[in-house]
Amino acid sequence: MIIRKEIEKREINTLAAYACLAVDSKGRNLPEEPDPIRTCYMVDRDRIVHSKSFRRLKHKTQVFIAPPGDHYRSRLTHTLEVNQIAKTIGAGLNLNIDLIEAIALGHDVGHTPFAHAGEQILNELISSGFRHNENSIRVLTKVERRKNQNGLNLSQEVLDGILHHSGYGTNANQAYTLEGQVIRISDKVAYVQHDIDDSIRAGLLKIDDIPREYLEVLGFTHSQRKATLVTDAIAYTRQQIEAKSDYEVGLSPLIEQTFRKLRAFMFEYIYQGSVCQAERTRAMFIIEHLFNYYKKHPAKMSPLYKQIADEEGLERAVADYISGMSDGYCVELFKDIYIPQSLVPDALKIFPDDGLN
């Protein structure tokens, strides 16, 4: 008995007509034998979860670099929140949850250390530019390895959803599946709401600082705002689809306009605020110096990046190497390379009286 076929049949019988069915997938770059239990999107989800790039997200910054507590979001917890929000919206629209989950869990695996500070400086240092959504595709198709081959060989729908989850750059257009479009809106809902929460925890923001007219529309608490946005996305998208006017996931005009204003407020007040900018400057300094070091000493990188350098140029190989680092690993490398180290680490134990007392 092939369980996968039962699941695929259930999708055909139960999912919405506009959902992306596993049996309709455009396939993988390299054809594979189907899994007997899992659909193609289940396989993709599992490959992403078990990848090294996914595990490293737990040590990558969301907004605040090296926050002084255990409850601030990391890039991994952000990813999990996006996944939860997206699956709720997907369920409300009767979409393919397995595809949604694969895209959600993989959407940020190409993010740099130090959040968007790392992305910004690499974009300035590389002549061809750097975008984290495009880099997520590079990680999943070139850097990660499976069965001695480069890349995880994921389905086209998963890669497309990851590539188009961000509304910036040359790939700012929407994903071609509604499941992929769900990730874009879920990403925004997640980061704006949890960044407000973390900013309040850090003492950088009070709820009263947010314009009251935004809160009156979206909600005064974290859970209220999230519920408003998720519920509206489901209701408005269903309304548009039923009217056959639009097959695109979105928010109603009032909610969309208010949410845009709230995001703009967060950019001005927090993301581009003095505290975050000071840390961004330090983080960019570290990455720029590591980038210059590895351009001069490419042999210090693993053989995989030597192959990338031969095929696509040294700049791209160094960017791939650095973008995969965690925040802590970046800092430790910088210390090892640029900060003088004592030749006798236990000197104070050997000579406790240094003559200064």
What are these regions (language model features)?
Residues 1-79, 83-89, 96-97, 130-357:
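Histidine-centered, transition-metal-coordinating active-site segments
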Residues 99, 103-146:
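A generic, well-ordered mixed alpha/beta core segment in the N-terminal half of proteins
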